[in-house]
Curated annotation (Swiss-Prot):
Residues 1-22, 87-117, 182-194, 363-395, 455-468 are extracellular. This is Protein Lilipod. Disruption phenotype: Larval lethal. Conditional knockdown in the ovary results in progressive loss of undifferentiated germline stem cells. It is found in: Cell membrane. It is a multi-pass membrane protein. Belongs to the LIMR family. Its main location: membrane. GO terms for molecular function: transmembrane signaling receptor activity. It comes from the Eukaryota. GO terms for cellular component: plasma membrane. Required during oogenesis to promote self-renewal of germline stem cells, probably by enhancing BMP signaling activity. The chain crosses the membrane at residues 23-43, 66-86, 118-138, 161-181, 195-215, 342-362, 396-416, 434-454, 469-489. It comes from Drosophila melanogaster (Fruit fly). In the ovary, detected in germline stem cells and their progeny. Also detected in the somatic follicular epithelium.
Length: 527
């Protein structure tokens, strides 16, 4: 009996060891995959003249590469945070469909739980350590009096970073004492990892969720405009070839006018220079006299050239408009019939469907919170994968939840970068500097870390937030969750109503103004 028990214990230990090794291998493969995709994205946006500028300075090249690598890692963590809920929901449905399959034995609760814990850990490291350190490291020059090199810059960066960390941690301790989470004591730093750092991440997640409250409803509206710009709209009662020919002829006419004005300006300049050389009379050293008719002639040409300059500006503006319209028509001409007839309407219908379902789920979640049927998003029970489906519609409902989560992420990003204060920070292809990359990676990390919280708060899914994500204190506040649902649903409905009724309201306002003017004119005529 003792030998059998020892063999069972040994088998359990071996199984636990193999499971741990397998999970770490899966995590490593996921990190490599996410890092590779993030590297492609960051390389697409970064400005390459920085490498050429410091190609002869090895220290600057090393600093730039380290900063670039950590920015890429931060974006990879952001992608992982955005994928947490979809991967967890899909894993639960796969285990329900194939509970005894040999090929999904590696997919278990321990793997998903570890994935959430790793993403939470790397999110904290990237947000509070890597990004601040990278920014300070890229801007550092070393203390005064030290030689140039990497080590003096590391010393300066570490010193400034430690001072900033002390300030932030002291403020966090004060805020936690103000909100009643823990009393401020002399040895408050002993509870740094268990109380203050989770509270700091809770504050950051709250700011991220509030930012998504502003960006997501606006993104619902802006996404329709983005699809309208990217996809080719159907041609209803339009002869595109005839319009293209008309725009092409008008563009050629504008170009001829610009060439004629430029030739006329050159001839005027040559005539003025020739007249000055042939007709000027010297009246002494340093003074030149021009006859009166020549002065009048030059002034007349000056006025004429000013008028022509305004004409040139108008013609250039019109030429740019014609060029953009001609490109749009050319895209219409070269697009296929299937793309014009089916893709654009299907995309619009899909956006309308996702938006309508999101609003209905928010309304349902709000009513269930008021009645008391729905529990708060704070995780309170033990997690187990593959026991029951999270949706009443089964795999179809789970797939719909995954699509809605991705839709929320897309709308929040589109709405965030459509804000007026983000126009200068918005990344551009091959034109984004390293500080802008750091800032955008930080924003993406905050938004993606808040995406699971947003999806759980507004009732998109019933999947519990795992790990430390579900232990955020303010998720258990009924007033905050209910108010968030009310504001989110109301704001989204108002933004969509404003989007789809703007043309009708504008036309109605114009008609009312026109009728008012006619009525006032009629009254004044009678009087």
């Amino acid at each position: 009996m003792d030998e059998e028990e020892e063999e069972e214990v040994t088998d359990l230990k071996l199984q636990l060891f193999h499971n741990t090794v397998r999970e770490h291998i899966i995590f490593l493969l996921l990190i490599i995959l996410l890092y590779s995709s993030s590297y492609v994205v960051v390389s697409r946006f970064r400005r390459r003249d920085r490498d050429d500028l410091y190609s002869n300075d090895e220290d600057e090249v090393l600093v730039y590469r380290i900063s670039f690598w950590l920015c890429t890692f931060t974006l990879a963590v952001a992608e992982g945070a955005a994928m947490l809920l979809p991967v967890s929901i899909a894993s639960n449905e796969v285990l329900l469909l194939y509970p005894n399959s040999y090929y999904v034995k590696w997919l278990n609760s321990s793997l998903i739980q570890g994935l959430w814990n790793h993403v939470f850990l790397f999110s904290n490291l990237s947000l509070f350590i890597f990004l601040p350190f990278v920014y300070l490291f890229s801007e550092s020059t070393g203390f005064v009096g030290n030689k140039k090199g990497i080590l003096p810059r590391v010393y300066e960066t570490f010193t400034v970073f430690m001072l900033m960390a002390i300030i932030v941690l002291v403020l966090t301790a004060v805020l936690s004492a103000v909100f009643g989470i823990e009393k401020l004591q002399f040895f408050w730093f002993l509870n740094l990892g268990s109380v203050h750092l989770p509270f700091l991440y809770s504050c950051v997640s709250f700011l991220g969720v509030m930012l998504m409250l502003i960006c997501t409803p606006y993104g619902f509206v802006r996404l329709f405009g983005v699809v309208n710009q990217v996809l080719v709209r159907p041609m209803l009662l339009r002869d595109v070839n005839e319009e293209f020919s008309a725009f092409y002829m008008e563009e050629a006419s504008v170009k001829r006018k610009l060439a004629h004005i430029e030739l006329h300006n050159v001839s005027i300049a040559d005539a003025a220079n020739g007249g000055r050389l042939g007709n000027r009379i010297g009246l002494g050293r340093g003074r030149t006299f021009y006859p009166q008719p020549l002065l009048q002639h030059s002034q007349a040409h000056l006025y004429q050239r000013k008028a022509m300059a305004s004409d040139v500006d108008e013609l250039n503006d019109r030429l740019r408009e014609l060029d953009s319209e001609r490109k749009e028509l050319d895209k219409l001409r070269t697009s296929s019939t299937f793309q014009r007839t089916f893709v654009y309407p299907l995309a619009m219908l899909l956006l309308l469907f996702c938006t309508a379902v999101t609003i209905l789920l928010v309304v349902q979640n709000t009513l269930e919170l008021l009645i008391g049927i729905k529990a708060l998003p704070l995780s309170t029970r033990q997690f187990a994968l593959g026991i029951s489906s999270l949706s009443k519609l089964g795999p179809f409902g789970a797939g719909l939840e995954v699509c809605l989560i991705f839709y929320l992420g897309a709308t929040s990003v589109v709405g965030f970068y459509s804000m007026p204060f983000m126009r200068k920070v918005c990344p551009k292809r091959r034109q984004t500097s390293l500080p802008q990359l750091m800032l955008n990676c930080g924003f993406m990390l905050v938004l993606s870390s808040a995406l699971p919280l947003l999806s759980r708060i507004i009732g998109i899914t019933n999947f519990d937030l795992l790990g430390d994500f579900g232990a955020i204190e303010w998720l258990g506040n009924f007033q905050i969750v209910l108010l968030y649902n009310l504001v989110f649903g109301t704001t989204t409905a108002l933004c969509l109503a404003n989007k789809f009724t703007a043309t009708v309201r504008r036309e109605l306002r114009a008609r009312l103004v026109e009728n008012y003017v006619l009525f006032t004119n009629y009254i004044s005529f009678i009087n």
